[in-house]
Amino acid sequence: MPETPSTLDRDTALLERLLGDVLVEQEGPAFRDRVFWLRERAAALRADPSAPDGDELVQAVRRLSSSDLGPVVRACSVQLQLSNIAEELERLRRRRAHDADDQGPQRESLAAAAAATAGIPQSRRAQALADLDVGLVMTAHPTEATRRSIFDHQQRVWALMEHLDDPRVGPTRRRALEDELREVLTVWWQTDDVRARRPRPDDEVRRTLLHVESVLYDAVPDFLAELESTLGVSLDDDRAPEGKGRGGRSGRVGRSPIGFGSWAGGDMDGNPNVGPETIAETLNRHRRTALRLLGERVDALAVFFSQADDRVFVTQELRASIERDERQLPRVTFPGASANEPFRRKLTFVAARLDRAAQGGEGGYAGVDELIADLELLRASCSSSRVAHGRITRLLAQARTFGFIVAALDVRQSAGPLQHATAHLIEGYADADEAGRQELLVAALSGPPSYVPEPEDEEARSTIAGIAAVGRAVADHGPEAIGRLIIAMARQPSDVLCTQFLLRHTAPDEHGATMRGVAPAVPIVPLFETVDDLEGAEATMGDLYATAPYAEHLQRCGGSQEIMLGYSDSAKDGGFIASQWGLYGAQERLVAQADAQGISVRFFHGRGGSTSRGGGPHHRAILSQPPGSVRGRIAITEQGETLSQRYPHPELAVRSLEQTVSAVVLATLTPAETPPDRYRSALDDLTRISRETYRALVFEDERFPRLLHQASPLAELSAMNIGSRPAKRGGTTGVDGLRAIPWVFSWMQNRLLLPAWYGTGTALEQGDRDLQREMVEGWPFFRTIVSMLEMSLFKSDLGVAERYLELVDDDVRALWEPIRAEHERVQSVVLEIRGTPELLDRTPALQRRLAHRNPWIDPLSHIQVALLRRSREGDENAQGPLLSTIGGIAAGMRNTG
């Protein structure tokens, strides 16, 4: 359905007007006029880059003191966040209008997937739904730049704008709602937008759970109901494989085709702030949250279920269950629930058992399976009426999806510390080569456990304690507590085997002692990150599959191997196209290898928010995966920066979930065809040329690290309290040691977005243009590459980026010419392939939305350049407003990294 510009423009204009009112009240009319004058100059410069407005804008910024620039930055940043809210409300409006107009299935919807697979036998469609296993893993983005307090104010604006959108609202109520908006905007304006301290892991845990509590917990039942009704099959079908649910980690009664995980509080990779205590505290918080959410809904259901005994059918099983509860929980009282209200009586016992489970008291539920069994007894008694398909079915969906843990905690550690710890436990390990290490590990895993004194090395002790926390978590909370143990920078079989050894070494027995001799059944997931590691993944996994102790561990974990693919570091290592093609080829080889050995494999895609980190719409990305690589099973990271974009409202959360799951259904039932050899040859050439071009600049030109540090706020990021994890690995200062996220963040800030496109122009220019157009039309993978390039080019801005050259050394400035030429080259080729005069001409609604933000982002960029110069010259007053420009540009670009 085409976008309705009038409603989006109306909302944006309203929010601009209301913010202007607040600025007048708080800072005076002259300040408001200054802010909007800067916006108008930026808009005029966009319309005519040769106009004098650019110099006027720069001179106006230079005339203002650093202290005076601070409030200007705040105003632009708040308006950009308000514009984002207006865009999200427009998405919601379009979804509702589409449903009301009944104009056929919406693009990327479950209904569209059902229509596309209508010719497939119902039995196959039912089996595809039974096989669905979609894991969405939330991460605490290290550069997620929105404070919790600001997030809360954004939610209030969202709700008030939604009320204003109701056509039944009259003039009096409208004025009252606008006054409420002014009040919220006033408090927002008076709130610091930069944290007073760097967030701790527990802050990130709370923020991650907030998205579940406020949106996802109630959106999931709606989505699952839509999934069943649209595809015409039941999620209660007993053909679901053993252990399905929560991304394949739970053996609960019933199942959910989607499951949620989290890295917040469990990601130890390079983060000294996460350790065994953090893991334990995080899971305790997860459990408390899960039981509270379930308890609140059971209490509400008990109030609602007031049916009298003589007016409903009550199964003998339910009556027996109530009698059993009365014997086991004799002290439970029934305020307002009489003996002739069996459903309410049962739900009172359910609430009591949940409360006891939360308190660790006698009589509480041992696990969520027991709760589900009780709810199923209630639903069976309601089976003859519509009551069975309402609130109780919603509660069952929530119990099956979120369980007693809300989201399984993933634990991640880098291969280096794991190997270092193992070397302190196995004699001769440190000096052995890879073959020798594998031999030592197989011997240690095959024989009985032996006592090894705790090492004196502090790093080794810390790593061992972190792995021990995994075993304790499973013992304390059950297998659903830990989603997976991820090995970052995995390169060789010993990286996985040493992790298995450490799991076994620290495994607790029923008394809490270690050395039980059997590692907990926690999936060990290698994360292949660089281009070279992706190429070597097949050999690594082949050796592991052939290793008896690991094969046994795999069987105890359900017989399925999960492999994580790193988009961020592979792109930093080899450039955009080399990363994408390397990931594609690795999946093809790993699927063929697993199929040959009868092993089921699921890929965990570590996508970021930006294009250069694999970001973009899930639907398109899933459909571009190699044939046979999905088969109903996939896991995807949901970066902290994108959670509020994908799940800002329950209805939009349903839309995001259906876009993801519908793509999995389509990729399973109608997989893409294997690309012909001429396509492969073309991609091989593109990869080789683009990687050589990219690395020649990024890794081989000694001036490049200075360009990165001088022409971006990379150094200043370390002072900004926007993540619990350091920006660099170890103490290195070059590109190699820089984490992929701040690497991308820096190029997003200076508007160049270099990692997303550099090298691709040279490669594409040398290719066959007719073949490239054919590939765009006939190959989803290449079509996605071109679409992502087009988006990145549109978001980049060489005119703004060139302003940052004022900050660099003279010899470094010489790098600008090849960068500018490559940008022009790739843009020219993309337009030739697309056959359009301008970028994003085929998606005018998106083009208009992105362009609409620029007049508010551009002043921030000019101010950032001025403040970077002043800060580096020693102006202490520049630091605060400078950090605010970082958050404002991130909000406007809708990406941090």
Q: Over which residues does each language-model region extend?
A:
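Structured alpha-helical segments in the cores of large, soluble enzyme domains
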Residues: 119-122, 146, 162, 167-192, ...
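Glycine- and acidic
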Residues: 1-4, 21, 58, 194-209, ...
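Active-site cores of enzymes that catalyze phosphoryl transfer or operate on phosphate-rich substrates
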Residues: 335, 339, 345-346, 404-497, ...
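Often metal-dependent polyanion-binding catalytic scaffolds in large enzymes
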Residues: 1-441, 459, 698, 705, ...
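C-terminal accessory/interaction regions of large nucleic acid-associated machines
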Residues: 708-897
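Generic, well-ordered alpha-helical scaffold segments in large soluble proteins
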Residues: 18-22, 38-41, 79, 215, ...
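Beta-sheet entry/capping signal
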Residues: 255-257, 261-263, 271, 396-397, ...
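Catalytic or ion-translocation cores adjacent to nucleophile or general acid/base/metal-coordination motifs
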Residues: 274-303, 506-692
